[in-house]
Amino acid sequence: MAQTGEDVDKAKSFQVEFACGNGVDDEEKLRSQWATVERLPTFKRVTTALLHTGDDSSDIIDVTKLEDAERRLLIEKLVKQIEADNLRLLRKIRKRIDEVGIELPTVEVRFNDLSVEAECQVVHGKPIPTLWNTIKGSLSKFVCSKKETKIGILKGVSGIVRPGRMTLLLGPPGCGKTTLLQALSGRLSHSVKVGGKVSYNGCLLSEFIPEKTSSYISQNDLHIPELSVRETLDFSACCQGIGSRMEIMKEISRREKLKEIVPDPDIDAYMKAISVEGLKNSMQTDYILKILGLDICADTRAGDATRPGISGGQKRRLTTGEIVVGPATTLLMDEISNGLDSSTTFQIVSCLQQLAHIAGATILISLLQPAPETFELFDDVILLGEGKIIYHAPRADICKFFEGCGFKCPERKGVADFLQEVMSRKDQEQYWCHRSKPYSYISVDSFIKKFNESNLGFLLKEELSKPFDKSQTRKDSLCFRKYSLSKWEMLKACSRREILLMKRNSFIYLFKSGLLVFNALVTMTVFLQAGATRDARHGNYLMGSMFTALFRLLADGLPELTLTISRLGVFCKQKDLYFYPAWAYAIPSIILRIPLSVLDSFIWTVLTYYVIGYSPEVGRFFRHFIILLTFHLSCISMFRAIASICRTFVACSITGAISVLLLALFGGFVIPKSSMPTWLGWGFWLSPLSYAEIGLTANEFFSPRWRKLTSGNITAGEQVLDVRGLNFGRHSYWTAFGALVGFVLFFNALYTLALTYRNNPQRSRAIVSHGKNSQCSEEDFKPCPEITSRAKTGKVILPFKPLTVTFQNVQYYIETPQGKTRQLLFDITGALKPGVLTSLMGVSGAGKTTLLDVLSGRKTRGIIKGEIRVGGYPKVQETFARVSGYCEQFDIHSPNITVEESLKYSAWLRLPYNIDAKTKNELVKEVLETVELEDIKDSMVGLPGISGLSTEQRKRLTIAVELVSNPSIIFLDEPTTGLDARAAAIVMRAVKNVAETGRTVVCTIHQPSIDIFETFDELILMKDGGQLVYYGPLGKHSSKVIKYFESIPGVPKVQKNCNPATWMLDITCKSAEHRLGMDFAQAYKDSTLYKENKMVVEQLSSASLGSEALSFPSRYSQTGWGQLKACLWKQHCSYWRNPSHNLTRIVFILLNSLLCSLLFWQKAKDINNQQDLFSIFGSMYTIVIFSGINNCATVMNFIATERNVFYRERFARMYSSWAYSFSQVLVEVPYSLLQSLLCTIIVYPMIGYHMSVYKMFWSLYSIFCSLLIFNYCGMLMVALTPNIHMALTLRSTFFSMVNLFAGFVMPKQKIPKWWIWMYYLSPTSWVLEGLLSSQYGDVEKEITVFGEKKSVSAFLEDYFGYKHDSLAVVAFVLIAFPIIVASLFAFFMSKLNFQKK
């Protein structure tokens, strides 16, 4: 047991041990023990408490040194049943504070006439960012000013969020809820224009630190995937600090001592434990884990799209917990219930209500679909519509207000759902209650006018007119310090986390080091004893080995771009929350990478130095190592700085590629400094590669063994250096070392400054078409038209086969990381019937999605037991996928096509080939109307949270894509998550209509309103742990399910107008089972309903007479040619509308071509010696290698993004993997050809190559094939690896290999015979041979070569092994390479599946 030190040791001598039944009064024992604590000094007293150990004795403990078991024991004692015990805990804490007369700090938030406007760009035509539109737009910036318009998000809103009260923020998507929350928390983007004022306790936002005073909980769940839930919360608790808790605790302790009050030991221990700052593990973390229901997954990692982790609902709760674990009592929470069931939402909101009412917290929460029970927990409501406040007053008066406006909430309708629908033009009429008066649409402005004229509006206006009395609040209510911790504590916290992340990513670092070892082994054997002979030729080989080492270390830094970008989202969030300053994050990430650089550089030096044959002196060995180390550090620092400045993957890729190009071009090896144009010579001194070359060459060529004098009266070493222009004297080594250290310091300083001052990446700017903008402007002045019923045209009816899915005793097991087997589903039996809409419900973590995945066949791991039948026959996944549709919880779509195109693509590939195009298009149109997407059918889908559709639009698109496939069976995983009540009702009406056509439909659902819940016909209810609690019909008004549960002894009756779904989840949750002392799963198995269901399932599992097993004449609905055409059409749209992908490639090759042309200006016309030919070869090498590297890098992210879409579409049997892969391959051809043409047109005349059509064609052909090869190799590396990080690490090795065996750093003739096969396998060797041989293989001009006279063609054959007669073979190999690599890409895409489900 942890102790406080000497004082506690003395106090322990007074500890009273007591046994049960010893006759001493418990209160006297407690007072006696408490007296020992009271004797301690003040500081020790507030960190010392009594902890009951469970054996009728108490120990004196130091709360700063509590062990995990002790913290959890205390929390379990305080909060066993969350709803009741949390309230009791807060009341006890408040009672203790009130007993000594301490007033807690409170905050009142006011906003007056608050307006927010955003600028958007107006374009003519459709606002789609195609390649042509982007080029046109970029050019127009220089010709004319772009047209912009302003969109009002919030329009003069005013209100008060009061302490001690819970306020609900309601409104449809797009009404400005998120903007209002961000404005109140001081977190609005700098790109928007803000008017009006916001104040806390009468102080404007500029007078204090609002980000620390209030806590804003975003809709986006951004977490570090490698950290567990507990680690995430512990870090947040540590960084947010304790606020004024310690000061309050000291004052409580002082006053209690004066009044001789003995507090409850458990309450005292808890309050003291959460009042200690900077702890690695916090008691507050255990408390938040408990009340948010995250204690069951506390040690599970957060995970992400590519790594397994917690569920979506748990991630949403983690986002909430990360903020509320801090000391702030002003909470602004944005849609915290997404992905949560209604029972869990009620529990969390109930805890927040208790915090507001008892602790005086100020809480404003926006919710999309609050259940009636959750809605009743709020004190006030702010109703937003069209950026304006319609109602801002007590919740209890809101129905009365709308009745006064002529609208009444129906009896079995949730008030929150009614409030969101009553503002809708399409839904308003059904709530009109003045039947004697004709209905006409009442606009938002009319509601606002009525509210302002009401007594409620008058009271709000009157309160706002009175200034806040600052004398009535505590000084510490507001925060005036940016950071809670000292600089040292912040650095320690960030360092601890960085070390943990490095441990979690150890496989990636080991993988990188393993590849480095492989590269080193290859390099040392390629350059085996290259330095054994000291002459100009072998000196050139040694230079090549040095360049290879430096290039490998340069490429080794490239993955740092992706790693840094991947963490920037979480960093930006935490920086905005003032968890820590940028330097506290930067310093650990810089320093802790140094040991890895030391290891990698040392491995390379140890393996290669003596084998290659460098100077054998030990001192020179270590000096060689030091240069490699400082260069490696400078490269990693440079890429880190680039990532912190550019912030997006596309910008980082192009900037990183340009940086590598510049470093190599001006590094002194590709083109010697002496050969560079004078006016570009300054570039040499700005390249870290130059200084690394200077350092390595000075270390080697000024060594004693290179001091042999040559005919020119200079040493052999100086002769080699003179040829390369690197002879800067013996002491240039230390100059180079100092320069490299300077680069390391400069880039790391730049990285830190960019993190500090660079604005966070924002959501892409809005673009609106000119026509749409004019339409919006005109509608502002048009009267609202009467609602007229639209004549319904005949619906598109497509044939389908009704199918029943039965499942008996289904069990599912997975293997845990510890090697144990864990069962997730227990003996699940049921049936999904045609024409029946089935709801699959349960609390978060009950196994709903797991069961849906098992039934649909989406699981890629684990063991499934039991029987699943379709139409009475055993399920065959290949045919089942053709007749079923699956709407995923996470909306995965191709980002660069429109909404309508997404549906057309799905219909094209999934509907039978005999259905004509007209029928398909009519079906697409009908589905668009059904899910109300017709208004945005021409909108780009975009990336979630970055561009394109909103969450609810994306959700409707997911459903629409499946509906157009005309499936017999539809699985929907949480189709209403992220939707408001109206959108959810629209979606569920569409789903119900689909079920009524005779299709089999099942969907999981978390927070159904009464209306939505009662649209279902049957219910499958699961409890936590994957066990079945109920399967059967709902009945009218849920009568059958209510009757079943009410028949169980001890279950409370459902209240009038209560949502049966919420009631059902409440009574079957774990705490309710504990309270009732029963197991609902066992109760179901013992019921007659279970026996009846077993009989029904057995009957449905038998095939009917005359029926046949599901079969199709072909594996896919379309022919192979049809699949290829459809996939190619989508890939064309995706490429054409992705300028960030293709335009950057075009810009890079233009820049590369121009730079090479300027550096090698007209050098091809005057070849006099081997160095002139080496320089020309260097120009070819630069164009081929670096243009290829850039293409390879940029295509990888595109393929990785589209691969997730590919997995979804392949599962649906939309197409063959080969059709998808070859469409991806073919779409690259025109873009690569365009790049090749641009490169050839620029480079060929400027460098001065022979102006021959034949030679020019060879140049174009070689570059074109080279770009294709690199593109396809990038695709292949993505196909071979589970995530982009691994692919990028593999890319570094690939670059090193194609560089080493290109024939540039080591010619073919000198490559050892055991590695010559690698030369022939390297595509760059063939490309360079084709370029050089076609230009000079037939040139008979004599040149000076290492002191001899030889013809150019003879030198090419003698030194490089290039023959002009071999060009036919080269031409064949060049076209064979892309075909082979493309085929390998297609093969591995079809065989490998890294999706873990």
Curated annotation (Swiss-Prot):
Span of domain ABC transporter: 138-411, 805-1050
Residue ranges crossing the lipid bilayer per the database entry: 507-527, 549-570, 594-614, 625-645, 651-671, 735-755, 1141-1161, 1173-1193, 1229-1249, 1260-1280, 1286-1306, 1314-1334, 1369-1389
Binding residues for ATP 1: G171, P172, P173, G174, C175, G176, K177, T178
Subcellular location: Membrane
Gene Ontology, cellular component aspect: plasma membrane
GO molecular function: ABC-type transporter activity; ATP binding; ATP hydrolysis activity
Tissue: Confined to roots.
PROSITE patterns: ABC_TRANSPORTER_2
Keywords: ATP-binding, Membrane, Nucleotide-binding, Repeat, Transmembrane, Transmembrane helix, Transport
Residues of the ABC transmembrane type-2 domain: 489-701, 1122-1336
CDD domains: ABCG_PDR_domain2
Binding site for ATP 2: G842, V843, S844, G845, A846, G847, K848, T849
Stretches assigned to coiled coil: none
Membrane topology: Multi-pass membrane protein
Gene3D superfamilies: P-loop containing nucleotide triphosphate hydrolases (3.40.50.300)
Family, similarity comment: Belongs to the ABC transporter superfamily. ABCG family. PDR (TC 3.A.1.205) subfamily.
Role summary: May be a general defense protein.
Protein name, entry field: ABC transporter G family member 41
